[in-house]
From Swiss-Prot:
Note: Translated by a ribosomal termination-reinitiation process from the bicistronic mRNA coding for VP1 and VP2.
The keyword Transcription regulation belongs to this UniProt entry's keyword annotation: no
Functional note: Minor structural protein that forms a portal-like structure at a unique three-fold axis of symmetry, following binding to the host receptor. The virion attaches to feline junctional adhesion molecule A (F11R). Once attached, the virion is endocytosed. Acidification of the endosome induces conformational change of capsid protein thereby injecting virus genomic RNA into host cytoplasm. The channel formed by VP2 may allow the delivery of the viral genome through the host endosomal membrane.
Signal is among the record's keywords: no
Domain notes: The N-terminus domain points away from the virion surface.
Protein family (similarity comment): Belongs to the vesivirus VP2 protein family.
Protein name, UniProt field: Minor capsid protein VP2
Location(s), subcellular: Virion; Host cytoplasm
Keywords for the protein's UniProt record, in alphabetical order: Capsid decoration protein, Capsid protein, Host cytoplasm, Virion
Record organism: Feline calicivirus (strain Cat/United States/Urbana/1960) (FCV)
Coiled coil location: none
Primary residence: virion
């Protein structure tokens, strides 16, 4: 009789442990899903920051160019190299963009 009760106790413990393992797996799965969602949100936030940064850079590049164009349109003689060099700014902008793309790649 004791051996039957011992066997029942062992089976009950085994089933309890199996259920706990399944619950742990489910919890880990949920944590994994939450972590993936958090990573996606972080990536989205970084992409938004990079986009805003790129817009600010483009405005900084286009601002001096626009000033030169307006000055020329108003009849002033303007040496564009004293204000800006388009190739220099384009190269800088592209270098920064590439570095950000490489930084946030998967």
């Amino acid at each position: 009789m004791n051996s039957i009760l011992g066997l029942i106790d062992t089976v009950t413990n085994t089933i309890g442990k199996a259920q706990q393992i399944e619950l742990d797996k489910a919890a880990l799965g949920q944590q994994r899903e939450l972590a993936l969602q958090r990573m996606n949100l972080d990536r989205q936030a970084l992409n938004n920051q990079v986009e805003q940064f790129n817009k600010i850079l483009e405005q900084r590049v286009q601002g001096p160019l626009q000033s030169v164009r307006l000055a020329r349109a108003a009849g002033f003689r303007v040496d564009p190299y004293s204000y800006t060099n388009q190739n220099f700014y384009d190269d800088q902008l592209n270098a920064i963009r590439l570095s950000y793309r490489n930084l946030f790649k998967n």
